[in-house]
């Protein structure tokens, strides 16, 4: 018998801004680090303000040498308040995962 292939799902291991953090200024980008390489065109975020309104972001991308890190540019300057990052990611083996976290920009 040959061993069965192991298929893991990508796990979120780090964020920038950090989950539940309070930062002083608007971030220029959101970065998500995962345990597996991702397919950027099938991965991304919805960034929402504290009223639940979607904030404009650019397309998600990965660096050629680090496909485990997803980078999403923030197009507009964010005002003070709480923001929620609703993310979804598809790994190279096509497993899809999703989740969310929040951060706050101080007054």
Q: What is each residue range found by the language model?
A:
Residues 6-43, 107:
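N-terminal non-catalytic regions of secreted/periplasmic and cell-surface proteins
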Residues 36, 40-107:
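Acidic, low-complexity Ser/Thr/Gly/Pro-rich repeat segments typical of extracellular/periplasmic
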């Amino acid at each position: 018998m040959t061993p069965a292939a192991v298929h893991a799902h990508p796990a979120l291991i780090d964020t920038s801004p950090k989950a539940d953090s309070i930062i002083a200024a608007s971030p220029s980008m959101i970065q998500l680090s995962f345990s597996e390489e991702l397919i950027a065109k099938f991965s991304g975020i919805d960034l929402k303000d504290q009223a639940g309104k979607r904030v404009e972001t650019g397309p998600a991308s990965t660096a050629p040498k680090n496909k485990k890190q997803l980078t999403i540019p923030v197009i507009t300057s964010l005002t003070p308040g709480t923001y929620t990052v609703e993310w979804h990611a598809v790994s190279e083996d096509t497993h899809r995962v999703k989740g969310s976290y929040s951060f706050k920009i101080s007054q």
